[in-house]
Design a protein with these regions (language model features):
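Short glycine-rich, Thr/Ser-proximal phosphate-binding strand/loop in the N-terminal lobe
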Residues: 2-49
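Short, well-ordered coil/turn elements that cap or connect secondary structure elements
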Residues: 11, 16, 74, 130-132
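Short capping/connector residues at structural and topological boundaries
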Residues: 13, 26-29, 102, 110, ...
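Electropositive phosphate-/nucleotide-binding environments in soluble metabolic enzymes
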Residues: 15, 49-53, 57, 95, ...
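Short glycine/proline- and acidic residue-enriched helix-loop micro-motifs
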Residues: 41-46, 104-109, 162-166
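A structured beta-alpha segment of the ubiquitous adenosine-cofactor-binding alpha/beta core
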Residues: 41-73
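Short beta-strand-loop/turn "lid" adjacent to the catalytic site in phosphate-handling enzymes
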Residues: 63, 67-115, 136, 143-151
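ATP-dependent carbohydrate kinase catalytic cores
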Residues: 116, 120-176
Length: 176
């Protein structure tokens, strides 16, 4: 399991830092790339990350590190955006995450069993370590919500769509 992250300046859109937590739950590799001059990069450093909560804490620790951090305090984090693979037909745009949104994402787990459960773990881990910070879900499937039925219906029995929402959704919408 992995976690990609970026920290942006909300006023200018400037990239402050980015990186990757890999092998969460196994042996943990942490990459941190601050974009400010004079800050030291960490590349695939061994860091214990038994859960997503520890991975997120490693990211936050790097962001506020006295020597190589790019912000002074976690209080500077105004919001967190989460890429969520599957929003089904429930979400045609990005949304502020509420308990109802979490439930709707969970309801889409059968449509993205490898991704949505991990997305939910990441969201809940962020909520745990950044309580009170607004979280936003950005859905890969939202970009393609304007497809007409003739484009998204598969040549399968219609009951698969009615009962299980099996249809073409289109993915990688956050790349467009």
């Amino acid at each position: 399991s992995s976690l990609k992250y970026q920290l942006l300046n909300p006023q200018s859109g400037e990239l402050l830092a980015k990186g990757l937590c890999e092998r969460i739950g196994i042996d943990g590799k942490f990459t941190y790339k601050p974009q400010l001059a004079g800050k030291e990069k960490l590349d695939a450093v061994d860091v214990a990350m038994p859960t997503h909560s520890e991975a997120i804490q490693a990211v936050l620790n790097a962001l506020v590190d006295e020597k190589n951090g790019v912000i002074a305090s976690m209080k500077e984090i105004d919001a967190v955006g989460h890429r969520v693979v599957h929003g089904g037909e429930a979400f045609a745009s990005s949304v502020v995450i509420t308990d109802e949104v979490l439930k709707a994402i969970e309801d889409c787990n059968p449509l993205a069993p490898l991704h949505n459960p991990a997305n939910l773990i990441g969201i809940r881990a962020c909520q745990q370590v950044l309580p009170g910070v607004p979280m936003v879900a950005v859905f890969d499937t939202a970009f393609h919500q304007t497809m007409p039925a003739k484009a998204y219906m598969y040549a399968l029995p219609y009951e698969y769509y009615e009962n299980d929402k099996v249809r073409r959704y289109g993915f990688h919408g956050t790349s467009h």
